[in-house]
């Protein structure tokens, strides 16, 4: 029995028995964040961002007469309500992290996520007020150096959209780090394989962030041929990086399922995304397709982040081939 016990992985001292509550709360935050991104994306798709010109920190006003809302106003106000829910859930998540999460670096990521959620809420409010409030518009133009109101509106819309998807990827990463999977034994792989997976994961994330920025440009500033071409070329680059990452990941030991499985999901998602991208260009009047293109973009970035986090945590590189 002593020999058997010796080869069993010992309990990780960083794993609190109460960590399951942090994980469950993080899952709730990520779920509502995806809903938030979905409604926000559709608001942009149907150009409904200015249907409610008023914005303040009186968030409870957004829940009044919600059932009577229609059309774009319904999507805009639901987007704000979901943002409020995400904010309060994130506060709960960070509180549970402070109490039960023993790893300081994970707690810090939680604090960063909460800070970004607050920033996102303020950015969303500024995006509304630069159109409806002349004083905010003038201040924003002076602060950014953008000379026209439309340009300021586009700038804040792009930053709000891009940061939202990056924040979602971070939240998904936190759900993974607080799950039981994170504490499974590491997998030994060759140093070359580990470097390839990590490098390709970072390249994929970088390419996806650029794609998100370009997509936000097209969605907020209107379709421009040059930007569409660059966005299409970027899609090919992302597809190439994902293909290379999938090939390398599938070549890993089967024990590295925590890296192999999300690589398979990523390869499937990129095909779906290309399909939605083509249809968004060919049939721009189909608003749901354009919104789905936005949502799948968020999922691509999130899955890529999971692969990157796991590539550093799960894979243990060794000099000799294993």
Task: Give residue spans per PLM region.
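Membrane-interfacial loop-to-transmembrane alpha-helix junctions, especially the N-terminal start
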Residues: 22-26, 104-114, 196-204, 256-267, ...
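Hydrophobic cores of alpha-helical transmembrane segments in multi-pass inner/ER membrane proteins
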Residues: 85-92, 162-179, 234-247, 298-311
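A loop-to-helix transmembrane entry motif
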Residues: 76, 80, 223-240
């Amino acid at each position: 029995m002593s020999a058997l016990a010796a080869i069993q992985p010992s309990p990780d001292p960083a794993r609190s028995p109460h960590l399951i509550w942090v994980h469950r709360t993080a899952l709730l935050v990520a779920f509502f964040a995806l809903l938030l991104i979905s409604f926000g994306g559709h608001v942009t798709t149907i150009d409904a961002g200015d249907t409610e010109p008023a914005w303040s920190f009186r968030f409870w006003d957004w829940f009044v007469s919600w059932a009577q809302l229609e059309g774009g106003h319904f999507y805009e106000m639901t987007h704000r309500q979901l943002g409020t829910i995400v904010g309060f859930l994130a506060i709960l998540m960070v509180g549970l992290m402070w109490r039960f999460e023993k790893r300081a670096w994970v707690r810090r990521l939680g604090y960063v996520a909460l800070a970004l959620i607050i920033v996102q809420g303020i950015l969303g409010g500024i995006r509304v007020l630069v159109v409806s409030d002349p004083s905010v518009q003038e201040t924003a133009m002076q602060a950014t150096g953008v000379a026209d109101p439309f340009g300021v509106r586009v700038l804040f819309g792009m930053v709000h959209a891009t940061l939202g998807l990056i924040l979602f990827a971070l939240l998904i990463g936190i759900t993974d780090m607080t799950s039981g999977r994170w504490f499974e034994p590491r997998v030994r792989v060759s140093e070359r394989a580990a470097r390839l997976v990590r490098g390709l994961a970072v390249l994929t994330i970088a390419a996806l962030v650029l794609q998100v920025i370009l997509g936000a440009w097209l969605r907020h500033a209107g379709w421009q041929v040059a930007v569409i071409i660059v966005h299409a070329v970027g899609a090919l680059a992302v597809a190439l990086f994902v293909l290379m990452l999938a090939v390398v990941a599938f070549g890993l030991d089967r024990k590295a399922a925590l890296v192999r499985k999300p690589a398979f999901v990523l390869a499937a998602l990129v095909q779906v995304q290309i399909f939605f991208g083509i249809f968004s260009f060919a049939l721009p009047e189909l608003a749901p397709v354009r919104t789905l293109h936005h949502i799948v973009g968020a999922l691509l970035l999130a899955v890529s982040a999971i692969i990157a986090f796991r590539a550093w945590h799960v894979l243990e590189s060794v000099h000799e081939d294993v």
